[in-house]
Amino acid sequence: MQGNMRLWMSVLTLCLSMLICLGTFAEAYPSKPDNPGEDAPAEDMAKYYSALRHYINLITRQRYGKRSSPETMLSDVWWRENTENIPRSRFEDPPMW
């Protein structure tokens, strides 16, 4: 009975933590502006196109600060193309004798 209760409590905790994580990811990007419709006045269409342009600029902008996260720093170190790290063949070195 005690083990069954622990199992259900751990499943409930896992489900709640997953819901919290999904809620966090949902707010990552701004929401797309609502289309006022085909027969909307010119001012509403101008506001919509301005909001849409702002939305597209936010979504497609370059994020310069994202490269400094620890994961990307490690991948840069591991996958960096550096001539010193590339192994050379013995035939490129001058003969020793």
From Swiss-Prot:
Q: Which GO terms describe its molecular function?
A: neuropeptide hormone activity; neuropeptide Y receptor binding
Cysteine-cysteine disulfides: none
Secreted keyword on record? yes
List-wise, which residues carry Tyrosine amide? 64
Kindly list the places in or outside the cell where this protein is found, as annotated in its UniProt entry.
Secreted; Cytoplasmic vesicle, Secretory vesicle, Neuronal dense core vesicle
Which Gene3D superfamilies did the record assign? 6.10.250.900
Q: What GO cellular component term, any one, is given?
A: neuronal dense core vesicle
Q: Its Gene Ontology biological processes?
A: feeding behavior; neuropeptide signaling pathway
Q: Which UniProt keywords apply?
A: Amidation, Cleavage on pair of basic residues, Cytoplasmic vesicle, Neuropeptide, Secreted, Signal
Where does the UniProt annotation place the signal sequence? 1-28
User: What Pfam families does the database record attribute to this sequence?
Assistant: Hormone_3
Query: Sorted alphabetically, which InterPro entries does this protein's record hold?
Result: Pancreatic_hormone-like, Pancreatic_hormone-like_CS
Q: What does this protein do?
A: NPY is implicated in the control of feeding and in secretion of gonadotrophin-release hormone.
The family note in this entry says: Belongs to the NPY family.
The name this protein goes by in its record: Pro-neuropeptide Y
The protein's organism comes out as Xenopus laevis (African clawed frog)
